[in-house]
């Protein structure tokens, strides 16, 4: 599954176009490598996503094409959530 599609389906990012913009800015890392929106991801991959001053590290638990809002958080596990100080 494409990275941008997963981020939208899992509701980590609201829109697929926004996920693409964030990836193009280099704010998403998959298994230690900067990722593009079209990067293929798999179950067990580790994602680091920077939202402003928050760095979220998650592990992918499942991949589904569509999911109900209540079940979206079952697609991933949050491993770490940290805040980055502004310089």
Outline where the language-model segments fall.
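Strongly charged
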Residues: 5, 17-21, 27-87
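Extended boundary segments
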Residues: 1-11
């Amino acid at each position: 599954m494409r990275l941008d599609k997963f981020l939208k389906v899992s509701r980590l990012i609201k829109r697929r176009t926004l996920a693409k913009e964030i990836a193009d800015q280099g704010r998403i890392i998959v298994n230690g490598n900067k990722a593009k929106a079209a990067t293929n991801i798999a179950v067990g991959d580790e994602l680091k996503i920077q939202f402003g001053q928050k760095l979220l590290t998650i592990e992918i638990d499942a991949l589904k094409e569509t999911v109900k809002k209540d079940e979206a958080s079952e697609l991933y596990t949050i491993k770490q959530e940290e805040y980055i100080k502004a310089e």
